[in-house]
Amino acid sequence: MRVTVIGHSCLRVETRAGTILVDPWLFGSCYWRSWWHFPPSTEPTEEMLRPDWVYLTHHHFDHFHYPSMRKLDRSAEILIPRFGVDVMSDEVESLGFEKPRELIHGREIDLGDG
């Protein structure tokens, strides 16, 4: 397994089963140009934009960064926590992704052999 810190809370986790991108804020600013990466982020690579899974921990803009989400390959499976409201799920679908898989607190999921 290899973990790469992209910036802020964004991680890229590579396993034998595939790649997971966590909280993709890959470039630019968020919160109306008031927050920026430090150190400054670099332009995302093509490889970075093609994860197998994307895990969004919650709906704050520095974790669910719309400009970054728009650049990601739509074949990625989106994973979100089950909160009991459909806001994150609806917004993921509005960006052109399939309905996300909701994760239940304390339960394991199988993402393949890795």
Question: Positions of the model-derived regions?
Answer:
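Beta-strand-turn-beta hairpins that frame and shape the catalytic cleft
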Residues: 1-2, 14-20, 108-114
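A short helix->loop->beta-strand "cap" motif at the edges of active sites that frequently abuts
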Residues: 18, 74-77, 97-98
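Structured loop/turn residues at beta-strand edges in well-structured enzyme cores
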Residues: 49, 73-74, 95, 114
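Metal-dependent catalytic neighborhoods of phosphoester/phosphodiester hydrolases
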Residues: 65-75, 90-93
